[in-house]
Amino acid sequence: MYRLLALDLDGTMLNPDKIITPMTRSSIQQLISAEVNVTIASGRFPASVWSHAREVSMNFPLVALNGAVTVDPLTGQLLDGVALKIEDMLFMLDVIQQEGAYIHFYGYNVLYVQEINDINRNWAINNRVNRPELDSFEERDELDAIEADLIRFVEVGKDFRTFVNQMPGMLFKAAVICTDHDSRENLFRTLEESGLFQCTRTGSLRFDVNSAGVSKRGALERLCHAHQIEREQVAAAGDYDNDLDMLQWAGLGIAMGNAELHVKEIANVVTASNAEDGVAQAIHTFLL
């Protein structure tokens, strides 16, 4: 019997329009009513993970920023975190700047950017919960504003090195965006081979950088240990590279139908795509 289901958000729990469909919502709530814990394990901001978890009444600790932080499901506050080290970030900045790539850093619900631009301008609002069922634009705008305010933007200026040396709080993740394929792959390889970082591809033009050893799997392992849940009692669903270790570790690794081939190959089972309520289908096929 499974005691925990861990769900990635984008490409998994959310459909292509970034919506929790009624079927997915109902299936998750049925699973929770059957006394199976359900959590989110995502690369997104803690506030975004928390907001989506509240939509389906999750009450198990949540995983955000690729496993760098765990989040209280009731309050949205930090439970535990693994931050990037200052000296490691300075090395990272040297490497990134040599290639002329874009980078920004994640605090706990704070996005630190050199300047607000077209790359990052909508980053906070894109983390909101999409609610197409709301009757009026006014209702949607009001909730969008509330949720966007949960994530702060801080412009630090051109000198990221000075900011990192004097940073006011912990930084848990960096996002690197580079449109040139060769430069991007060189950056990924250099940072990964340094042994200082865990790098994961999260899009066609970008990758995320966490401290070495940080992963969704690692965060779930710690949570399971604290709640006396065995690995064999865990199911996990995902679609992308930052889900690989989680799917391989879980007792039941579920790849989405929209996942790339290498993700499907390491999973135990493949469900329908996120456009076809694949999470709901997996819940009813394997967990209920």
Predicted regions and their residues:
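Hydrophobic packing residues within well-ordered alpha-helices of enzyme cores
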Residues: 24, 49-53, 187, 263, ...
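Conserved beta-strand scaffold positions in the cores of enzyme catalytic domains, especially
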Residues: 62, 78, 155-157, 199, ...
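Conserved acidic, metal-coordinating active-site core of Asp-based
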Residues: 99-101, 106-234
